[in-house]
Amino acid sequence: NSWLPGGVHITKGKLRGEKSNGMLCSLKELGLTLNDFPYAIEDGIWILEEDCKPGDDINTVIGNDDTVVDFEITNNRPDCYSIIGLAREAAAAFHRPMRHHEPMVHGSAAGSMYDKLDVEVPAEHLCNRYTARMVTGVKIGPSPKWLRQRLRANGVRPINNIVDITNYVMLEYGQPMHAFDYRYVSSGKIVVRESTQGETITTLDGNLRPLKPGMLVIADGDKPIGLAGIMGGENSEIVADTTTVVFESANFNGTSIRQTALALGLRTEASGKFEKNLDPMLTIPAVQRACELVEQLACGDVLDGTIDIINHVPQPKQLELEPDRINQLLGTQIPEADMVEYLRRLEIPVEGRTISVPSWRP
């Protein structure tokens, strides 16, 4: 006996007088889509790889048998809403070295982005930092199998290589990203501003949303093309014939994002992260990683140059290490030398008794 998505029950039976012990299934009948397996036929019988045998577990055959560890992260640790953040904690806990990957972008002979895109941030009190890079010669298509599998394992639906890259970077770094189709960025200008009376936007989910004055939007020279930190606009989405892309990696005011998401009834994974007040220093490595993946997947040419507008960056904080008070509060007897070692494992610098708090650590 088997159950298919949608409540379809498969049992032994007879079909045209012959015994039937099963059913040949299409992607759709298995609850899968062409986004997951782009080289299959959605409505036809799904032909599996030649090396599988009758009786093999379908999850193993299609690479859907990865082990997923679910962590419950408290709201005061947004730095752990990412693979890198969790790796840092795991490295410290198991006393293993943390291997950092520095994204490398080669650029191309396609020129510079500076004569193609202009960015203005009049709502600087709501946008701490706005970073953008451009990719031309884009070839939209399915992502490679390894990328689709990693996204699916994290509950993210694969869409296409460019959109998948932005989602993958968000999982790695905890930094939400967005990609705009440059064709639809009027006047080659991006403006981070507050919405005005009577403005509307149709978001990527197909819903027309009236905007209240004061909501933070990403606009071009004429109109809103995205809800900042929440969801992009349908009028600038990445489609099959997109050839030039603007990558956005920004840091928005968490309170503003939360209020807009609540007012519109539109909470997304991106808005949930921005509400926690992310580290503004993430925007550069995230956009660099996205461009590195573009080059690795050979799906476009990264233009030289990075637009990086910084309005507010938190000042470095320093704390005094007080071993006696810490042990009193925790009811422990941890030696001071061990405390310093624990902090250093967490990549928190300590000089004497002065702790320098990293920008990523709340």
Predicted regions and their residues:
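RNA/tRNA-interacting regions in translation and RNA-turnover enzymes
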Residues: N1-P362
